Design a protein with these regions (language model features):
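Short Lys/Arg-rich basic patches
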Residues: 1-16
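A general marker of short, structured functional hotspots
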Residues: 17-18, 56
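Surface-exposed, Lys/Arg-rich phosphate-binding patches that contact polyanionic backbones
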Residues: 20-32, 36-38, 42-45
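Short acidic, gly/pro-rich beta-turn/loop elements at beta-sheet edges
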Residues: 16, 25, 67
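C-terminal structural segments of small proteins and small subunits
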Residues: 45-68
Length: 68
């Protein structure tokens, strides 16, 4: 498990995701030349209020992997 702390809208928040999801997120960030924090902020802005941020990140990574 990997715990990440990022600033979103001026406040710090943490997510916990499995190492495999973190590795995939790092690869996507490198390909897109974006920071992990920027990707997580985008995910946070577009998620519905029913899912927690860690789950939303996992789903985003999975959808991205299926797209490619």
């Amino acid at each position: 498990m990997k715990k990440l702390s990022v600033s979103l809208s001026g406040h710090r928040t943490s997510i916990s995701i499995e190492n495999e999801f973190f590795d995939a997120l790092q690869k996507i960030a490198a390909i897109e030349k974006r920071s992990i924090a920027a990707i997580i902020a985008e995910i946070d802005d577009t998620r519905d209020g029913r899912s927690n941020l860690s789950s939303a990140v996992r789903v985003w990574v999975l959808r991205r992997a299926m797209r490619d």
